[in-house]
Amino acid sequence: MSAASAPAVDTARAWETVLQRIESDLIAGALTPGDHLPSERALAAELGVGRSSVREALRVLEVLGLIRTQTGSGPQSGAIIISRPSGGMTALVRLQVAAHGFAVRDVVKTRLVLESDVVTELARASGAAPTPALAPALEILDAMEQPGDELTRDEFLTLDQAFHLALAVASGNEVIAAMMAGLRESIEAYVRVGASVLPSWDDTSTRLKAEHRAIVAAIEAGDPELARTRIRDHIETYHAETNVSSIHPHREDT
Amino acid sequence: MSAASAPAVDTARAWETVLQRIESDLIAGALTPGDHLPSERALAAELGVGRSSVREALRVLEVLGLIRTQTGSGPQSGAIIISRPSGGMTALVRLQVAAHGFAVRDVVKTRLVLESDVVTELARASGAAPTPALAPALEILDAMEQPGDELTRDEFLTLDQAFHLALAVASGNEVIAAMMAGLRESIEAYVRVGASVLPSWDDTSTRLKAEHRAIVAAIEAGDPELARTRIRDHIETYHAETNVSSIHPHREDT
DNA sequence: GCTACCGTGTGGTCAGACCACATGGTCGGA
DNA sequence: TCCGACCATGTGGTCTGACCACACGGTAGC
C-alpha cells in the first residue's frame, strides 16, 4: 500500500531528503519558530548526506523565508527557524515576473483583488466594533503628513508601501498580507520608475495622502462598499497615471 | 555616493551574486523560457565563484519553479528556464503552514477571495460574449460525471482541483491562477484527509458536481453576483463539512 | 545498414580544507 | 577583587577536487 518493499525510497535527491526531514519536524512540532536547527555538519552526519546537500536545502529554506542564518557562535548563530513569508513571496513573484511568468498587469490586478478584500473585511469588522488594529496604519499616515518635512518620492513610496501592508496585517490574514507584500515589492522597481517621471509630484502626493485618509475613513465608518471603491480607485488611478502596467521587464530593442 | 572606494560591493554572498546575475539576464531578455543556462562549471568559472555556490543558487531557482534540471547530455540536459509559478507557490505556502507562519484557515480564506474574483470576472466577460476559455473546465466536469465509472475519492479530488484551476486559467490572470494552485496544493493533504472521513461520499460528490454545474451556469448567464455567491458557498460548505480549517499541522499530544 | 560500444559532458554528491566571525571562557595585570 | 586582553571553539560561507550515474552522439564492428 505504501512502499513496495524495502529498497528505493531513497529515490529523492539528497537535498530533498533534508528538506523533507525539516518539514516533517516542523509538522510534528519538533521544530517551531525560534528554534535552532542542528549545525550543518551535524545535520549532514545525522542524515547521511554531504554537507553541501544540507546547504542546498538550507539555502532554499532561507529564500523561502523559513530560516535565518548567522555566522559566529552564541545564541544568535546558526540557522534559526523564523517565519517571514513575505520575503519568500517577494523573491518568488519578482523572479517570475522577470522570467515572463507573470505580467506586471496581472500582478497589479491581483494586488487589487487582495487589497479590496482586506479593506472590505476591515470595514465590516469596524462596523461591529472599533478596530485598534488600524493603529499602525494610522501612525504611518501621520508620518507621511509631517508638516515642514517634505518627503522625497522614495521616502513617500516607502511609507506608502508600509501603509498598505499595515492594512493587510490589520485584517489578520497573514497569507493575504504576505502575498500583498510580495506582489508589491516585486513590482516596486517599476513603481519607483513610474513615480520618477510624474510631472507634478506635489499634486500626486497630496492626492494620495487624501485618498489614504478617505480609505481609512470608509473603514472606520464601517462601510465596506465605500472602502472597496476607494481602494480600487486609489490603486487603479495611480497605476494608470504612472503607466506601470505597460512597463515591460524585457527590452525589445538592441 | 554609492561605493566608498573600489572594494566592497562584493558584500553579497556568492550564491546571491549568481542569483542576481541570472535575474538580470532574465530581465534583460538574455534568458527566456526554453533557454539553457550555462553549465554549472561554466557559470562558476564565469562568475568567479565555486561550483557549490552556483548549485545553491540553481537549487533556489528550481524550487521557485524557474528552472528544470536534468542529468546526462543532449538538448534536454542541463538547467533549462521554465516558468512554473505554481510549483514555487506550493512549496512556499506548504512550508509556511508547516512552520506555523500560515494558518490553514487563512489559506482557505485567501483561496476563496481569489476564486471569488475569478468567477466574477468570468461572469462579467461571459455576459458580454460567449467564453470559449471555459471549455477546459467543462471537459473536466464531463469527466467527473462519467456514468458507470465511479471515481474514487482521490480521483474525484484530483479532477475537482483541476476544475478550479481551469477556472482560474480561464480568467486569464496567471498570477491568480498560480497563487490559487499553490494555495490549493499546499493544503491538499488536509483536504484529502478531510474527504476520507466523510460519512457519505456519494452524497457529497453528487452535491459537489451539482454545485460545479451551477457555478458554470451562473458564469455563462453572465451573473457575477450569483457566481460569486455560489463559489463561496461551494468552498465554505466543503471546508466546513470536512473541518479542514481546524486541522492543525501540529500534534499537541505526546 | 544496423547494432553495439564507448567517449564526452551534464548534473548530483561527497570529502576535505580553509576563512571570517562571534562567543565565552581563561589568564594576566591593575 | 575586578577588569581587560587573549585565544580556543564552533558556526556558517566558500572553494577545490574528486567521484558517480546518466544520456547523448559518434564510431567501429558485424
Report each predicted region and the residues it spans.
Chain A
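C-terminal effector-binding regulatory domain of bacterial HTH transcription factors
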Residues: 1-3, 224-254
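Short linear motifs at protein or domain termini
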Residues: 1-113, 120, 124, 250-254
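A short secondary-structure junction motif
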Residues: 25, 29, 88, 186-194, ...
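Conserved amphipathic alpha-helical segments that form helical-bundle/coiled-coil interaction surfaces
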Residues: 107, 111-193, 212-214, 226-238
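Short helix-capping and inter-helix turn/linker motifs at the boundaries of alpha-helical repeat units
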Residues: 154, 205-206
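Extended hydrophobic/aromatic segments used for targeting, binding, or gating
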Residues: 194-205
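Well-ordered alpha/beta subsegment
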Residues: 220-221
